[in-house]
Swiss-Prot record:
The lineage of its organism: Eukaryota, Fungi, Dikarya, Ascomycota, Saccharomycotina. The gene is PHO3. Pfam families: His_Phos_2 (PF00328). GO terms for molecular function: acid phosphatase activity. InterPro entries: Acid_Pase_AS, His_Pase_clade-2, His_PPase_superfam, Histidine_acid_Pase_euk. GO terms for biological process: phosphate-containing compound metabolic process; thiamine-containing compound metabolic process. This is Constitutive acid phosphatase. Its EC number is 3.1.3.2. The active site is at H75 (nucleophile), D338 (proton donor).
Amino acid sequence: MFKSVVYSVLAAALVNAGTIPLGELADVAKIGTQEDIFPFLGGAGPYFSFPGDYGISRDLPEGCEMKQLQMLARHGERYPTYSKGATIMKTWYKLSNYTRQFNGSLSFLNDDYEFFIRDDDDLEMETTFANSDNVLNPYTGEMDAKRHAREFLAQYGYMFENQTSFPIFAASSERVHDTAQYFIDGLGDQFNISLQTVSEAMSAGANTLSAGNACPGWDEDANDDILDKYDTTYLDDIAKRLNKENKGLNLTSKDANTLFAWCAYELNARGYSDVCDIFTEDELVRYSYGQDLVSFYQDGPGYDMIRSVGANLFNATLKLLKQSETQDLKVWLSFTHDTDILNYLTTAGIIDDKNNLTAEYVPFMGNTFHKSWYVPQGARVYTEKFQCSNDTYVRYVINDAVVPIETCSTGPGFSCEINDFYDYAEKRVAGTDFLKVCNVSSVSNVTELTFYWDWNTTHYNDTLLKQ
């Protein structure tokens, strides 16, 4: 399967790129050999399917009819942010100014290595065919979005038989907007699609896909007392190992931590990364759990205000579900950021909030939260509402896998009967108050999410932000 993808990419490259440098052709053997580490990169690396699929078919249960489909997706693979890029460049500066021969796992730097960030303008941006470091790279955000669109049509294309004109909603980050546009391109020209760019600025208040941006009450340091307990001596060990192999290098534990991000973003930009081979399997596990902890206690159920933040969008999706019989549109497609999806899944109860993650050790048996499983680059969450005979059901499909609601999954395909789902959802949002908890009034007077209902008259076209 993967070879066919590589060959198709190669064919496209030959048509569109003219002469491919021989060095890049030599690298094709490395592409696709590192996919086993994607789940350990904290959602910074390329897309992969949810590993815990429980063996449940994602096909519509036999004899059922889809009534409404909602999608909430993350932007595709990207270059690092400005801040993360600056950190990676500092480590690269140390390495590039080392005057001796590299040894051990850094020896690849002796072979005319080219740093993957070739242009500062690429920071914050989607990786594309045009800005990728390797014309054979199958992991660009552009290709991911287009491939997702074709897979979407294969799975749900029948939903468009009587609906060829519809909106797609995107947060106003440039990379989110670009992902939505590549997805539109992948759907093909048989559709008349209106791309609605919805503000993610603080002033947008509740009328946004990115409620966290309008939440001045949110404090990323709120649970540092927990996070600081996590043992990060493995980073010291990495730095010591590399320094021992390369006398006078003087890498720090911060450099070691940065190398994990370097690995992930280079995969997005190049299709492979020799930096990824620096780490042992144990080190990847420890890094991955550290990323899980940070997300759980900053953007997930470990932070008590997140359920209220996610309720802003979750309540809107509930309203759409309840209006499915009266709404002309049957498919609702939205693109945003990973934190927004984590907030949403926290409110929905898909991420376990009964047991907080421990920072004392890596809980192999008890950990059900893996950040990268939920929000790899290009993540997608589908809410399916379907009817079987006279009964209606709801279920979630996350990154190609059906993920049942544990306490409500007795319906066909492990779905939740609609009235039971509404009861469940009511309990999930009980006590939440996005406007109050976030102190939204201090930054905006917008108190309601309306873009799903007024897009046709408002025509959202907000200024794109490079963030």
